[in-house]
Amino acid sequence: MTDRPHHRPSGRPRRPSAKARPPGGARFVRPPLSIQVTTLWDYPSQDYGDGRQGIPGYKGATPSYIIWNLLQRYTKEKELVVDCFAGSGTTLDVARDLNRKALGYDVHPARKDIFRVDARKLPPELTGKVDFVFIDPPYGTHLDYGDDPRDIGKLDLADGTAYYDAMDQVFGEIHRVLRPGGHMALYVSDSYEHRSGKGAFHAVGFELFARMRKYFEPVDIISVTRHNKTLEMGNYRKAAEEGNYFLRGFNYLFILRK
């Protein structure tokens, strides 16, 4: 059964406090947030402050400082922020921390304040009313979030243009709901897959950027340092060296304007 989307963001779920401790037992203290001023972004934690944003342990969650920086730059208080691949709700939590209105959609809603909606068919009543859209879409069939056949992440990157065509529809919907002068941001990485002893590189970022340019004016391109634990695991690094391929050390953050 499909939840009915509406324009009243529901109350903020209670978020657990941070308990992260580095080796040695000393409590890790997250540094204060600040506006990133170069095109290389880095922050040593998934979350900021003393609490958590989104659901702890959710696979593929967006680092919350990225959304914080975007909303500080491109939105004002009371403006409407939408995330149509809302995942664990990180965008919703950050937006509410900053006194922005927020709506989250996903075909696999993980919280009650996220509505079960396909990003290719956003609610018609949103047309021209959204100030900012953030998306961190699934790609490459790396993660399985559920059985909904509308899940774009189930489209294989190696299977022609199906994934990119689906994302093109998403970009068209984002263009429809954004107000003139509104901004969107896409957070994504390229992909390298092993198939039957062979490797396949997929330039996901460039492919999606080319599609977005049909609808939007580019503002800037950011490289975001990845802090995935596997990047430091010896077996992963050894396999990359012996297999003559590269581990993904950064994500793209494409910022565009309607």
Kindly label every feature range from the protein language model:
Residues 1-258:
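Class I S-adenosyl-L-methionine-dependent methyltransferase catalytic core
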